[in-house]
Amino acid sequence: MLDEKIKEKIIKELLPALEKEAWELSDDMAAHPELGSNEFESSRKIVEMLCRHGIQVEYPYCGLPTAFRAVINPGGKKKAAFLAEYDALPEIGHGCGHCASGMASVLAGLVAQEVRDTLEDVQIDIIGTPDEEWGGGKVLLQRAGAFKDYDFAAMVHMNGVDSAEAKF
């Protein structure tokens, strides 16, 4: 459990320091949308960002050329994952918001990297899940074993209203 000082640091220092970089990349992906299984520039730019922040990245991942897995606090007894989508739709680009949704997961991972010493025995991974609109990227990753051994996984998805839901 994070203590109040760490929570305050996240809200007052880390998020403001990291969000500009994350949202600039989201805007870049929105301006240069890539369809499923062709997210080569988007995935490369996300991976480069993660590496700049000292995060270990496996790329490509599980046989998918635009999938990746970034590992924060490796070796933890518990494993959690943030899933990041980044594919676009034909003609309307990022109308579904994957550029922003994916970057919200990446931003959560960047914050986790900054407070990794407080994570105790929890490994946090960011898993890039390509081709979500048409090809079922998460299904392909699951079949390749990408999600085995996780205790928890979550993702963000854009919505037209302010809401928070847990889907089980």
Task: Please identify what each model-predicted range represents.
Residues 2-125:
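Acidic/His- and Gly-rich active-site-bordering loop/insert found
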Residues 66-69, 87-95, 99-100, 119-168:
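Histidine/acidic-residue-rich, glycine-tolerant segments that coordinate divalent metal ions
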